[in-house]
From Swiss-Prot:
Subcellular location: Cytoplasm; Cytoplasm, Cytoskeleton
PROSITE patterns: BTB
UniProt pathway: Protein modification; protein ubiquitination
Subunit structure, as described in the record: Interacts with TBCB. Interacts with CUL3. Part of a complex that contains CUL3, RBX1 and GAN. Interacts (via BTB domain) with UBA1. Interacts (via Kelch domains) with MAP1B (via C-terminus) and MAP1S (via C-terminus).
Species, as recorded: Mus musculus (Mouse)
Domain BACK as annotated: residue spans: 134-236
Pfam families: BACK, BTB, Kelch_KLHDC2_KLHL20_DRC7
Gene3D superfamilies (UniProt xref): 1.25.40.420, Kelch-type beta propeller, Potassium Channel Kv1.1, Chain A
SMART domains for this protein: BACK, BTB, Kelch
Protein name, UniProt field: Gigaxonin
Post-translational modifications reported in the UniProt record: Ubiquitinated by E3 ubiquitin ligase complex formed by CUL3 and RBX1 and probably targeted for proteasome-independent degradation.
Tissue: Expressed in brain, heart and muscle (at protein level).
InterPro entries in the cross-refs: BACK (IPR011705), BTB-kelch_protein (IPR017096), BTB/POZ_dom (IPR000210), Kelch-typ_b-propeller (IPR015915), Kelch_1 (IPR006652), KLHL16_BACK (IPR030579), KLHL16_BTB_POZ (IPR047070), SKP1/BTB/POZ_sf (IPR011333)
Gene name, Swiss-Prot/TrEMBL: Gan
Length: 597
C-alpha cells in the first residue's frame, strides 16, 4: 500500500478547544470540581491535567474513586475570579492582564506550573516597569523566579535611580531594603550627593521612627564620593543633615585627599556600556588568542583606551560571543589545533572571572548566536566535516541545553540577529552559491517564515537588532562586472519591521568596497552602533567606526590605530565604573597631576 502524503488542518486544534470549552457549561461533560474558598467550579479532569502538571500530579497521587462520587480538587491561594480567568486561558490561549490582577495571576500560574502563562505575565510586567514600581516589581520577580523581569527591573533601577528615589515606593522601603538599593555599584547618579540626598528624604519621611536606623543606613553610603564643602553647606541649611553627620562618624568633613591617596580611596558609582572583544587571532603570527579587552566609547571621550580583562581559559577563533542578563557568554569555535569545540564559558564583569558552561549538543564554529529573554540560541555553523543546519538553545538560569527545529537551509557564514523576540537568519552560502534570502524564526510557534530578501547576496556579514530595526554590515560577494573571483565588500543594509523592506545605508565613511575590509561585529550602545573590524578607508585602516542611527552617518572612534588582533568576537557589556577604574589604575591608564604644596 502506498504511503501517501500527510495533510493537516491548521484550524483543527482551535475548533476542538472551542468545542471543549462549550462543554464546561454542561454538567454531563464535567467529571470533577475545583474547590476554591468554599466555592466549587465544574471542570474536566483530563483537560486540566493536560494543562497543569500540578493538577496532573494531584490526580496521580490521589486518583478518583469508582464509587460514583464527584472528584474534588482543592486549591489554596487562588481566588475564584482568577481561576475562572485561567480556565478561560486554558481553553483559548488568551487572558486579560492588568496591573490590579497581574500579581494574583502570576501566583496562580506559579502554583499550577503553567509555564506558558507565566511567560505571558513576564512580558506584561516588562512593559509595566517604571520609576514608581520598579523596586516592587524587582522584589516580586525575585520571589517568583521571573529572572528576566528581575534583571530588567534592576537595570531600570540602576539607570533611573534619581527618578526612583523621589517616588512613594522608595520612601516606604524598609531599612534593610534601602541599604540593599543604595549599595548597588551601578547606580547611575554621577555624584554621590544624589544618593545622600535620597537617604535624607527617606529619613525625613518618618524621622521619629527612622532615626534609630540612621547610622546603619548611612554605612552603605559611598562616603569617599561626597564633597566636604557640599556637606558643610548642607549642615548650615538642614538641621537633619547636621544631626546625621554628627551621628555618623564615617562621613568626611575634612579636606579631600590628593594624589595617590585620593586614587586609592576613590570609588565611582555608575556603569559604562563597553565594547568588548574576545578571542580571535594575533594579526602577525595568526595564532589564536584568549585575550579579552574592553573600550568605553561613552565613558571618557578623551581616554578611549583598551582595558585588559581576564582572558578566556583557552584560545578560541571562529567562536560565538554574546552578552545576556549582565554576563558575557563565549561558545564553540576552534582551538589552537583547529579542533572544533562544544565547550563554553561565562564571564562575570563584577568579579572579572570566567566559569565553564555545560557543553553544546554539537561542536561547531562559524555559527550564529542570538539571545531572547535569557535564552541563547545557537544556529548552524560547521563541525569541521560538514555544514550544520541544527539549532539548540541554552537557558542561562536553568543551565540546560535543548534542541530546537533545524534551519530550513545551510547558511555557511551567514549572519543572525534578534528583533522583537524573533530570530532572523540572513545571507550566507552553500556549495559556492551565496544567498540574499532572509528567514524569521518565532520561538513561540517554532516556525520559520521567509521575509523580504537582502538587496545584496553576501556571506561573512554581521547583524544586530535594535528595537524594530535590523542592521546588516559588511560581508563579501564576487564582483558582477568582471570575469574572475575578485571579491568586494557589500553595502550595509537596514530593515524596519513596519515597512518590511531593506534599504541601503550610506557606507561612504565606513570603508571602501574592497575585499581587504572585513567586519567582525556590530555592537549597539545607546543611539549608536559600533562596527568592529579591519575597515579599509582607502588611506588607512580603522578598527572601530560609530554609526549614529538618528543621522545615518559614520564617525571615527578612538583608538584609531589598528588592533594587534583580528577576527575577534565582539559584544556590548555593562560594567561597573568602580571595576573599570580599578583596572585602569592597575594597568597604568590614568595619569594624574599632583600640585606641589
Amino acid at each position: 500500500m502506498a504511503e501517501g502524503s500527510a495533510v493537516s488542518d491548521p484550524q483543527h486544534a482551535a475548533r476542538l478547544l472551542r468545542a471543549l470549552s462549550s462543554f464546561r457549561e454542561e454538567a454531563r461533560f464535567c467529571d470533577a470540581h475545583l474547590v476554591l474558598d468554599g466555592e466549587e467550579i465544574p471542570v474536566q479532569k483530563n483537560i486540566l491535567a493536560a494543562a497543569s502538571p500540578y493538577i496532573r500530579t494531584k490526580l496521580n497521587y490521589n486518583p478518583p474513586k469508582d464509587d460514583g462520587s464527584t472528584y474534588k480538587i482543592e486549591l489554596e491561594g487562588i481566588s475564584v475570579m482568577v481561576m475562572r480567568e485561567i480556565l478561560d486561558y486554558i481553553f483559548s490561549g488568551q487572558i486579560r492582564l492588568n496591573e490590579d490582577t497581574i500579581q494574583d495571576v502570576v501566583q496562580a500560574a506559579d502554583l499550577l506550573l503553567l509555564t506558558d502563562l507565566k511567560t505571558l505575565c513576564c512580558e506584561f510586567l516588562e512593559g509595566c516597569i517604571a520609576a514608581e514600581n520598579c523596586i516592587g516589581i524587582r522584589d516580586f520577580a525575585l520571589h517568583y523566579c521571573l529572572h528576566h523581569v528581575h534583571y530588567l527591573a534592576t537595570e531600570y533601577l540602576e539607570t533611573h535611580f534619581r527618578d526612583v528615589s523621589s517616588t512613594e515606593e522608595f520612601l516606604e522601603l524598609s531599612p534593610q531594603k534601602l541599604k540593599e538599593v543604595i549599595s548597588l555599584e551601578k547606580l547611575n547618579v554621577g555624584n554621590e550627593r544624589y544618593v545622600f540626598e535620597a537617604v535624607i528624604r527617606w529619613i525625613a519621611h518618618d524621622v521619629e521612627m527612622r532615626k534609630v536606623h540612621m547610622k546603619d543606613v548611612m554605612s552603605a553610603l559611598w562616603v569617599s564620593g561626597l564633597d566636604s564643602s557640599y556637606l558643610r553647606e548642607q549642615m548650615l541649611n538642614e538641621p537633619l543633615v547636621r544631626e546625621i553627620v554628627k551621628e555618623c562618624s564615617n562621613i568626611p568633613l575634612s579636606q579631600p585627599q590628593q594624589g595617590e591617596a585620593m586614587l586609592a580611596s576613590f570609588k565611582p558609582r555608575g556603569y559604562s556600556e563597553c565594547i568588548v572583544t574576545i578571542g580571535g587571532e594575533e594579526r602577525v603570527s595568526r595564532k589564536p588568542t584568549a585575550a579579552m579587552r574592553c573600550m568605553c566609547p561613552l565613558y571618557d571621550p578623551n581616554r578611549q583606551l583598551w582595558i585588559e580583562l581576564a582572558p578566556l581559559s583557552m584560545p578560541r577563533i571562529n567562536h560565538g560571543v554574546l552578552s545576556a542578563e549582565g554576563f558575557l557568554f563565549v561558545l564553540g569555535g576552534q582551538d589552537e589545533n583547529k579542533q572544533t569545540l562544544s565547550s563554553g564559558e561565562k564571564y562575570d564583569p563584577d568579579a572579572n572571572t570566567w566559569t565553564a558552561l555545560p557543553p553544546m549538543h554539537e561542536a561547531r564554529h562559524n555559527f550564529g548566536i542570538v539571545e531572547i529573554d535569557g535564552m541563547l540560541y545557537i544556529l548552524g555553523g560547521e563541525d569541521g566535516d560538514r555544514e550544520l543546519i541544527s539549532m539548540e538553545c541554552y537557558d542561562i538560569y536553568s543551565k540546560t541545553w535543548t534542541k530546537q527545529p533545524d534551519l530550513t537551509m545551510v547558511r555557511k557564514i551567514g549572519c543572525y540577529a534578534a528583533m522583537k523576540k524573533k530570530i532572523y537568519a540572513m545571507g550566507g552560502g552553500s556549495y559556492g552559491k551565496l544567498f540574499e534570502s532572509v528567514e524569521c524564526y518565532d520561538p513561540r510557534t517554532q516556525q520559520w517564515t521567509a521575509i523580504c530578501p537582502l538587496k545584496e547576496r553576501r556571506f561573512g556579514a554581521v547583524a544586530c537588532g535594535v528595537a524594530m530595526e535590523l542592521y546588516v554590515f559588511g560581508g563579501v560577494r564576487s564582483r558582477e562586472d568582471i570575469q574572475g573571483s575578485e571579491m568586494v565588500t557589500c553595502k550595509s543594509e537596514f530593515y524596519h519591521d513596519e515597512f518590511k523592506r531593506w534599504i541601503y545605508l550610506n557606507d561612504q565613511n565606513l570603508c571602501i568596497p574592497a575585499s581587504s575590509s572585513f567586519v567582525y561585529g556590530a555592537v549597539p550602545i545607546g543611539a549608536s552602533i559600533y562596527v568592529i573590524g579591519d575597515l579599509d578607508t582607502g588611506t588607512n585602516y580603522d578598527y572601530v567606526r560609530e554609526f549614529k542611527r538618528s543621522t545615518g552617518t559614520w564617525h571615527h572612534t578612538k583608538p584609531l590605530l589598528p588592533s594587534d588582533l583580528r577576527r575577534t568576537g565582539c559584544a556590548a557589556l555593562r560594567i561597573a565604573n568602580c571595576k573599570l577604574f580599578r583596572l585602569q589604575l592597575q594597568q597604568g591608564l590614568f595619569r594624574i597631576r599632583v600640585h606641589s604644596p
